[in-house]
Amino acid sequence: NIAATINPVRALADRVHAVGGHIVVDGVSYAPHGLPDVAALDCDVYLYSTYKTYGPHVGLMYTRRSLLEQMTNQGHYFKDTTPEGWLTPAGPDHAAIGSVAGLADYYDNLVAHHGIEGTTRRDRVASLFAAFAAHEAEITAPLVEMLIAHDRARLVGAPTADHAVRAPTIAFHVPGRTSASIYDALIAAKVSCGHGNFYAHRLVGSLGLD
């Protein structure tokens, strides 16, 4: 949410698995900008919130089956026969889960609108996300380049708009000024922005930012 770093998950997964570990990937900041491929990543767990991809406020978790079967029951003692039972201690929210299907409709409509073709739905949606990425890189590049060249502003994260390296989330700071004062100045200039830690509290603290 701050640095916008796209981590080399597959390389990290290979190293983790080499010593018998499991890797959990938090994709909440990536999923809106890139189509996750858990098989290619070879991760054991992948999580994100579907509201980040224009869906309902529901958490989504993929878990490798072999790891899933090692988990302890989180629900009623008599609901321990299936993952669906032991991972829903209070029972599923049927309406919210059902509304996740709207995500497929949303992407299908965008695919049709842009005339994207492909053999499978995933192929078509992958092409759609590639179009998203190209557009995002195009519109963020001028701002990223301006911040890199600025004599006072400091871009947080990789100094590039390359979508393979960073997501199109842009954070910066100006040494000697508070983020609140920068926010106020930009809002006064009718530039939409925000300030704060954006749930990256430890990162902001480690970077020494306010």
Residue ranges of predicted features:
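Pyridoxal 5′-phosphate
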Residues: 1-210
